């Protein structure tokens, strides 16, 4: 009994020991949890989740549940791929509404990683213009005429070699064009055996170009749509220019001969 009493006293003494301020207080270890580890743990936990047909969630451990294969309709399989039949159905609906979406243009760079080229972007701009403003981006042709070929014949004559070719390009009668050229130059001339225009005087190719531009602006180009597809006709002593593109018509001024200097000798008494 005495031994037991001594042991109890020792325990009480240890429990009521005086406070020692020199001793350091033990610090608790702070465990820093990595958020990535937490995400991995959550992913491992959620892998076992599966949704039953009744809509209730059930935990099936860590094993993944196999996905059920979707059975295709035999009618779709006989017709071909499911996507093709769906596309056909959509096309029928669109045609019924009057709006066709399947005709959208596909550009070469779509579905690839390469950069687009300047010509491709230019084509895209014109496609957008044709869709939104068909009048502005119509099939307007640009007429390019060859420059006049001029040769010298002797010292006092000039030969217009490709005169007939330019008349065919403008769709005008050679007599009308020749009358305008001679009136503007203030000289005389005629066609030779090779259908070349021989003019009296010395003229440079620039002179012919300037006169032909004035003739085209006055007797060829339509002032409304700027189209060269016009017809020059004479009605009641007046010339009318009718456009085949826009249908407009206008009267043109008759060709007036300018001042022609008389160089030859005059007869006596006149």
UniProtKB/Swiss-Prot annotation:
GO terms for MF:
mRNA binding; translation initiation factor activity; translation initiation factor binding; zinc ion binding
Per its UniProt record, what SUPFAM superfamilies does this chain match?
Translation initiation factor 2 beta, aIF2beta, N-terminal domain, Zinc-binding domain of translation initiation factor 2 beta
Protein's organism: Triticum aestivum (Wheat)
Q: Which domain of life is it from?
A: Eukaryota
Q: How does it assemble?
A: Eukaryotic translation initiation factor 2 eIF2 is a heterotrimeric complex composed of an alpha, a beta and a gamma subunit.
Q: Zinc-finger as a keyword?
A: yes
Q: A single GO BP annotation from the record? A: cytoplasmic translational initiation
Q: What is its main location?
A: cytoplasm
Is Zinc included in the keywords of this UniProt record?
Answer: yes
Q: What family is it from? A: Belongs to the eIF-2-beta/eIF-5 family.
Q: Which GO terms describe its cellular component?
A: cytosol; eukaryotic translation initiation factor 2 complex
The record ties this protein, via InterPro entries, to: IF2/IF5, Transl_init_fac_IF2/IF5_dom, Transl_init_fac_IF2/IF5_N, Transl_init_fac_IF2/IF5_Zn-bd
**Protein name, entry field:** Eukaryotic translation initiation factor 2 subunit beta
Q: Where is the signal peptide?
A: none
Pfam families for the chain:
eIF-5_eIF-2B (PF01873)
Q: Where in the cell is it found?
A: Cytoplasm, Cytosol
Q: Please give the function described in this protein's UniProt entry.
A: Component of the eIF2 complex that functions in the early steps of protein synthesis by forming a ternary complex with GTP and initiator tRNA. This complex binds to a 40S ribosomal subunit, followed by mRNA binding to form a 43S pre-initiation complex (43S PIC). Junction of the 60S ribosomal subunit to form the 80S initiation complex is preceded by hydrolysis of the GTP bound to eIF2 and release of an eIF2-GDP binary complex. In order for eIF2 to recycle and catalyze another round of initiation, the GDP bound to eIF2 must exchange with GTP by way of a reaction catalyzed by eIF2B.
Keywords for this protein: Cytoplasm, Initiation factor, Metal-binding, Protein biosynthesis, Zinc, Zinc-finger
Please list where the region (Disordered) is annotated: 1-38
